[in-house]
Amino acid sequence: MQDASRADAFQIRRRQFLHSGALLLTAAANIRCGATEADPTVRLRIGLITDLHYADKDTVGSRHYRETLTKIAEASTELKKLSPAFMVELGDLIDRADTVSTELSWLKKINQSFSAICDEQHYVLGNHCVDTLTKQEFLGAVGQKQAWYSFDRQDVHFVILDSCFRSDGTAYQRKNFEWTDANIPAEELEWLKSDLQQNKLPTIVFAHQRLDVADNHGVRNNADVRKILQESGNVRAVFQGHSHQNDLHEISGISYCTLAAMVEGTGPAANGYSSLEILSDGSMRLQGFRRQQSRSFS
């Protein structure tokens, strides 16, 4: 009887252990969407976040502005574990405010959290970033010199684009624009063409307004932009935000990947952020968290 009691007790403890382990695995799976163990062939890892829309104001529709602080805290914890080489914020870091001082205060608060994830950050301007602020005010506050530029890391070329211009070439600022009138001006197009002609490395482009659609979320002259990207022969993918939903199109061999907005929805499960891994064989893997879908790019 004593041996039977010991056996029963062992089985109970075993079931309790297995149940606890299953709960832990389930909790971890709920944070990462399609996540895998870090691959030893990863040569560069980049953190991506878009459409945070932080603001100290009440919820409007599905946009829970104040919850962004909690969501970015989780993103910071998870992404720090992966040690990204740099972070890219794909636009709309803040939401609109009535005054310059209010927008700057919101920007300072959210950027403290974003810039703490790793040592290097890059910011794509979104229409909400310069709703009240000028571009110089926003860029000065986050410590970035230019709105569009390029740089190289680990034999990969990266391009940051700025589509916050009206059709007449006027830069967004001080509520002087309609959000549906997004354009890349001639000067920037000329720079982009020259930059890509001089570059022979595989290239990734970061944008806010979409370069792959003709609806209100698209850059009005995005066909001109795509032509330049295609003719370069080196552009692998474009990562963008603005429409707040997961989406993916391939046009002429270039992947246009739209990322989920962090601001949408309430609670931990409504978060969205990702890690882009560039592998030694030239392929790429987007590891999505929460609402962000994971993707593979050959």
Protein language model regions, located:
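Active-site neighborhood of phospho(di)ester-bond hydrolases with catalytic His/Asp-centered motifs
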Residues: 49-50, 87-91, 121-127, 204-207, ...
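Catalytic metal-binding/acid-base residues of hydrolase active sites
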Residues: 53, 93-94, 128-130, 164, ...
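Short acidic, glycine-rich surface-loop motifs adjacent to enzyme active sites
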Residues: 94, 196-214
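Short, solvent-exposed aromatic-acidic interface loops
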Residues: 287-297
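N-terminal secretory signal peptides
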Residues: 1-12
